[in-house]
Amino acid sequence: MELNSEDVLVARYGELVLKGKNRSYFTKQLKINIKKAFKKLEINNSIVYEFDRIVVFDIKKEQRAILQELFSFLPGISLFFFASQIVREENKLLDLLFNLFKDFNSFKLEVKRRDKNFAENSSNFKKYLAVKLFEKYQLKGVINNPEIIANIEILKEHFLVFTERFKGKGGLPVYSSGKALVLLSGGIDSPVAASLVMQRGFNIDFITFINEPNKNQKTIEKITRLANLISFNKTICSGKLLVFDFTAIQKELIHISNESYRIVLMRRVFYKAASMFKYDCLVTGEVLGQVASQTIENLKVIQSATPDTFIVRPLIGFSKDKIIELAKFFNTFDISIEQHLDTCSEFSPKNPTTKAKLINVEKLESELIFLNDLIEKGVSELSND
């Protein structure tokens, strides 16, 4: 049976449609992002940008997997589907539906008129198709528990038919909100934080702090895989990973006179080093009260290390269950739970302070006369790479 149909991908914008006068700014950035991604992935299909959606034409079977993966990751896309597009002739639509339903015993139709000039309303046209399919092919339409559901969109010159929708990440296009540096560990929280800010339009890079890198190659490889996953192998954002050798600084911090402040001082070092790269903001996976260093008192003292730097903590009020749910949604969970050597846990004292005082921190830092030089040296080495 020759159906003369063309496979297309249709992707919807989601909240971009609601942006009013600023809408064109966001949709223009989304177009740029798609063009860059297609070029990197060597996809040459033609694209039409409509008011509330994108249509990619002439989808080949071998392209579906990579396009599905890309549009699942691409911020700014709320949902998408692959569809068969045929000329708007009822006999061709019936033939396509029969070909689609022939291996099933029951079906359901959903019809949407995007072309409001179409003579029949959606409900009547759906009934008409169901009767024709039963008369010609003895196919039975049902309301409850059908084996297959076909969605039909009526366009000006074509019908679109599809059976499955895929959820996108939603949000705003990358590069529409500035550039952020994410403090990325190998755990569950920071990859989720990175994914959330990317959804809000940030172009992101990553920095991770490793002690004795030669002994932590597996950890570095794990964090690299997370960075590549979040950035879709640098296809949808910059995705650069900076690996900061923390060994010399850690050897300094081990000698402070009050070991309960170790983690607080260590995180202040992280903030100071990361802020020297002059991004629009820093992003962390900190969650209020989740661990000893993340009490409100400690977070205030840690943040005071970089008073002129904007710190974004997307997870600050989330429960662990919610963060795990998001990690699974962003596909980072499986990598995050792989075992690795963690700088914080290796360095943590038996009784970490939960109520750090800035006066005590400043006194302890004054004991470490080489600390700032070591931070600047580490930043300089990465800046010159």
UniProtKB/Swiss-Prot annotation:
Where is each THUMP domain found?
65-165
Query: Which GO BP terms, alphabetically?
Result: thiamine biosynthetic process; thiamine diphosphate biosynthetic process; thiazole biosynthetic process; tRNA 4-thiouridine biosynthesis
| One CC-aspect GO term | cytosol
Q: Which InterPro entries match?
A: Rossmann-like_a/b/a_fold (IPR014729), ThiI_AANH (IPR020536), ThiI_fer (IPR054173), ThiI_N (IPR049961), THUMP_dom (IPR004114), THUMP_ThiI (IPR049962), tRNA_STrfase (IPR003720), tRNA_sulfurtransferase_ThiI (IPR050102)
Task: Please give the pathway this protein is involved in.
Answer: Cofactor biosynthesis; thiamine diphosphate biosynthesis
Q: Which reaction does it catalyse?
A: [ThiI sulfur-carrier protein]-S-sulfanyl-L-cysteine + a uridine in tRNA + 2 reduced [2Fe-2S]-[ferredoxin] + ATP + H(+) = [ThiI sulfur-carrier protein]-L-cysteine + a 4-thiouridine in tRNA + 2 oxidized [2Fe-2S]-[ferredoxin] + AMP + diphosphate; [ThiS sulfur-carrier protein]-C-terminal Gly-Gly-AMP + S-sulfanyl-L-cysteinyl-[cysteine desulfurase] + AH2 = [ThiS sulfur-carrier protein]-C-terminal-Gly-aminoethanethioate + L-cysteinyl-[cysteine desulfurase] + A + AMP + 2 H(+)
**What molecular functions are annotated in GO for this chain?**
ATP binding; CCA tRNA nucleotidyltransferase activity; tRNA binding; tRNA-uracil-4 sulfurtransferase activity
Q: What is its EC number?
A: 2.8.1.4
Major enzyme class: transferase
* Family classification: Belongs to the ThiI family.
The name of this protein is: Probable tRNA sulfurtransferase
Q: Which organism is it from?
A: Mycoplasma genitalium (strain ATCC 33530 / DSM 19775 / NCTC 10195 / G37)
